[in-house]
Amino acid sequence: MSSRINIGVRHVLPIYAGLAVIAGVGAATLLRQTAGRWPALRVPLLFGLLGWQVVSGALAHPDYLSYTNEITRGHAENFVAESDLDWGQDMHRVGDFLKKVGATEVAFTPYNVSYLQAGHAFPKVTPSDWYHASPGWNVVSLGGWKVFNHPGWAGQRKPQFRIGRTHWAWYFAPGEEPKVE
């Protein structure tokens, strides 16, 4: 069962109106105070700030739910975890990725196991081993890894693939000893 609740936006939306008023007052004050000084700078500065917001939103597309800001440089898992990052929004991408690579089985323990029952196209799923990567495909939910350190081996290996913003994947050929990096 998946959830359509967006906990981050749900709690922030009520303050947007107040922030917009404050930003408008600030912009008007800035324009008034700089009317005699730096006249060539004030309008480009305001359009630059507005453009920054537009570009920031466009770069986050379509991952608005897991977007944080430019400081994270696309690695929000280094700053936030749990429901701040993963609401199951990338589960369809995980299923599509596994189908694309022809996986028939995957070692995977999602942050919320009910995500597997939400109708996503997955091959056979076996629980991840905490100590060792399994032969074949391994997928790690960043939310589960950051909150529960499960699986423990994930932090010792650079991911081979990033699926959306909330999952990592590796492939280890049968008989191959996964290397610690």
Predicted segments with their positions:
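Hydrophobic/aromatic-rich transmembrane helices and adjacent perimembrane loops
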Residues: 5-30, 170
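Alpha-helix capping/termination and helix-coil
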Residues: 18-22, 31-34, 52, 98, ...
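Transmembrane-helix signature of polytopic, lipid-linked glycan biosynthesis machinery
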Residues: 1-8, 58-61
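C-terminal luminal/periplasmic domains and tails of membrane-associated envelope-modifying transferases
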Residues: 69-181
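Conserved short-loop catalytic and cofactor-binding motifs
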Residues: 2, 11, 82
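Signature aromatic-anchored transmembrane alpha helix within multi-pass, membrane-resident enzymes
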Residues: 26-63
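Helicase-core coupling region on the C-terminal RecA-like lobe
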Residues: 57-75
